[in-house]
Amino acid sequence: MRNTFTLALIAFSFFAYAQKKTIDSLTMDYTADKGILTTYFKPEKGKLLLALNDSVLEKPLLMVTRYVKLPANYSAYRNAGSKTAEGVISFELKEGKLLLRQLSYVNLAEDADPIAQSVVQNNLPPILGVFEKMNSEEGFHLVDVSDFFSKDSPGFNAVGETEKKNYKIGSLDSKRSFIDRVKSFPRNTEITHTLTYPAAAAPRSNRSETLSFQLNHSIIALPEKPMKSRTVDHRVGWFSLEQYNYSSEALKSDNYRIASRWKLEPKDKEAYARGELVEPIQPIVFYLDPATPMKWRPYFKKGIEDWKGPFEKAGFKNAIVAKDPPTKEEDPDFSPEDVRYSVVRYVASTTRNATGPSVKDPRSGEIIESDVIWYHNHLRSYRNRYLLETGAANEKARTLNTPEEEIGEMMRRVIAHEVGHALGLPHNMKASSAYPVDSLRSGSFTQKMGIAATIMDYARYNYIAQPGDENIRFVRQMGPYDDYAIEWGYRYFESDAAEKKWLKDFVDTHSLNPIYQFGSGGNDPNAQTENIGDDPIKATAYGLSNLKIVAENLEEWTTQDGQTFDDLQELYMELIGVYRRYIYHVVALIGGVNETRIVKGQEAIPYYNVSVQKQREALASLDQNLWKTQKWLLEPELISRFENEGHLDLIANLQKAALYRILN
């Protein structure tokens, strides 16, 4: 009993002694870095301490987690720069401890409304971490967060559930996990750490049965005053965040969506009000990844700055700027993982894709930062489809050694598309049906208007233009819908009433014009992917006519003496895919329902069936181009160049799938 009492007394005395020690004495052998969260780091011991000022407590902080490095062949869509988690956190002082909570801004109510109390009670923020307070002095509270950032703590999402199952990933190995580096700035703190896991079925080429990940956490202060939000109009496409207002008079919680937008305000508001072009206080800046090959950088920059024109429609000049990555001398703190920098990432990956995700303030929809991601092998996708879809009418496409300026032009437009996502715009699959089919055979029309009304559709190439058509634009470009959508999202207003009226009038006067319509798919045959033109039957007829020419010349255009037929086989398989897309554009007419997004008072029918006559024409087209054996796809001289015993099944399965879709 006496020993127990003695031990307790010693422990209490030690605790009391520790509390008497100053923060300086407790951190004297640590590397200090002052910022929004003052950090004390001792890498040789794996120790990280945070000193939080009272001014930070219970303030919303945005925490974004990204991969810095990850294992080879881990996932097609998880790469360096990919976001694994994003959320708002806050630190709360409670009984000598600091709690780390995750906040939500989905369910809301006016502060003065009694129901606000119920909203709070029924939306308790989860606790992600609890830290014993080491000391407090002069408004600072010192805590040890070493374990939190050395383990797989809640909210990191380092390992995806699918990958965890597929690779049989076990629990974190703490002996092989550690904090790498820490950096703090006035508005953000960056913490990088390595996490290691055993994996009984690791990805191919990994025989160690071990997976290590390096992640970066950006903790950034959100604006003291949230940006004024803009409620979405369903007739204009915008990425958005859903919120529920329990102070609504609608006899239920009023759910609505707020648009995801960058905060753009004019430097000279009086000049802006006069209709003059004005620079924003803070432009949108995208840096190129240091890993971007030099020869592609000019095209990436052009793709980013293609959006300058649409922003001018909204009254802003130089609203978006592309920059090379700064040197260490220019900006020693630059890091693509730092949430202060928006970067177009160039990823060494076999994935054929590109993406444009962004980080948002959930209170207002303000876009804080975005990282556009370009996957290296996406180059091959565009080269192949350029040949297959335009080669019949476009001499420059009839080779696998596509001219650099042609590849660069395609990359430019892909970057512009992904930057559009980063600005808040989703895909608009309706826009590719805005133009009359035969206008896409006109050089003057396509050079001025492009091949679709927006860069945000999956309308990549002009497959309608025929051999002999002159001065044709074959690659997509910015369109009138892009001007329209950006003006809706970014035009600045001082008055809420003026904003509401102007936006409604603006959409009311534009939204029934096909070039300004928005649609996202479903059963609407005019909102399909990879199509162009207002008549799927006619467009497909032109496309198939061209594809037959390409098939006849495929070997000549893809192989040279002394080479294998691997490229020929790859292009043949992709040619079948192009054929399938053209056919399915017609299939969509059968049982299709045209959609026009309207509001009460507009003279249009929101939903109407495709006419019987048009559906019969579609069946006749399928009878000619699908049900009858397409011998041009099965030429023995072509097929015999490579072993493909399943080529007959490819066509048969396509026929079956189309029939199943029609009947169901």
Model regions and ranges:
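Bacterial Sec-dependent N-terminal signal peptides
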Residues: M1-K20
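Auxiliary tRNA-acceptor-end handling modules of aminoacyl-tRNA synthetases
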Residues: Q19-T292, P310, A314, P325-Y382, ...
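Soluble non-cytosolic domains of exported or imported proteins
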Residues: S55, S82, S253, P290, ...
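Zn2+-dependent metallopeptidase catalytic core
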Residues: L57, K295-A319
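Sec-exported extracytoplasmic/periplasmic mature domains
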Residues: E305-F316, G420-H421, L425, Y461, ...
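The catalytic-center signature of Zn2+-dependent metalloproteases
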Residues: D324-V347, E409-A465
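Extended catalytic-interface subdomain
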Residues: T355, K360, E366-W374, R412-L423, ...
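Conserved catalytic/binding loops enriched for acidic/polar residues
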Residues: S432-N664
